[in-house]
Amino acid sequence: MNQRINKVLEQMNNRGIDHLIISDPSSIDYLIGYKNHPGERMYVLLLKNDGNHTLFLNNLFYLDQELDLNIVWYNDTDNCVEVLSEYLQEANCVGIDKFWNAKFLLPLMEYTNGETHYELGSICVDYVRMKKDEHEQELMIKASQINDAAIDEMIKLCALGNMSEKEVANKLADIYRSLGSDDHSFTPIVAYGKNCADTHHEGDDTMLKPGDSIIIDMGCTYQGYCSDMTRTVFYKEVSEEQKRVYELVRDANLAAEAIIKPGVRLCDIDKCARDFIKEGGFVAEFNHRLGHFIGRDVHEYGDVSATFDMEVEEGMVFSIEPGVYIQGKFGVRVEDLVLVTKDGCKILNSYTKDLLVVG
């Protein structure tokens, strides 16, 4: 049995869960090394505390590898939920991951005996995925190195001054491929001027003009692991207000990163950056959490926010991305990924955070 599944079983035992239904393809791949995109069909990895694990798979899907667990095949004419229920008749507490569709869960509850208890069990896998092993860390470091190189190319394109937000964003896929990345990890954000005040702006036909801020928020995947970073630069000139806001956000980023080490609460890291920006005169203008966890998915369980008081542990990887957004004028965000080490953290992005005026 692999170490990852052993760690999940330990979490199940701690929570009194004897059967765990996992439907998230990313988590199934993480645990058994099998990739599948089931669409609307039932796809379940059932973990049992006795070690007798089973994968439920529609026979339309292709399996070309040996898996060290039971495989139950079903077809479209079978009642797949009834098939699954036969493996839960002795269950006392069934954990369900947060992705499983109600169209499967609700009928399953009718098939199993009335004494079976169901509860949200995602944390059993989520907690294990929060802490990256050495191989995962190496892949995420490489993904961030690719991102550093790619954002340099993106900023050079912006400096030309003759491409719209959308045109620059559309160049990124080719840049990533040339650097050895698999794909985007999310749709990139390229925003100019007042559009930078929209934290999730969708690139359009806006063109640059002197004095505009430029936000580029982008990420790639490398061998299944994600990167994510943001830099803000300025086109041709920068005002004193823009300079002050940029330095405030950049220094908030640095201050938060400086306190990261095992034992520090994630909410206190958020507070560090938020208080720093508040002292600079901005409260409502910093309108999102400080960061999110990342790995196989660009947004994984856990965040760096006022409401998440978990303590940092070695091997965790998350973003630090303070921002100030002044509606109708401009916005600034600076984002790195950090890897928690034994006594601090490693910043995975090396691209400069000095104030840059391009073009």
Predicted regions and their residues:
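Active-site neighborhoods and metal-handling regions in enzymes and metal-associated proteins
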Residues: 1-359
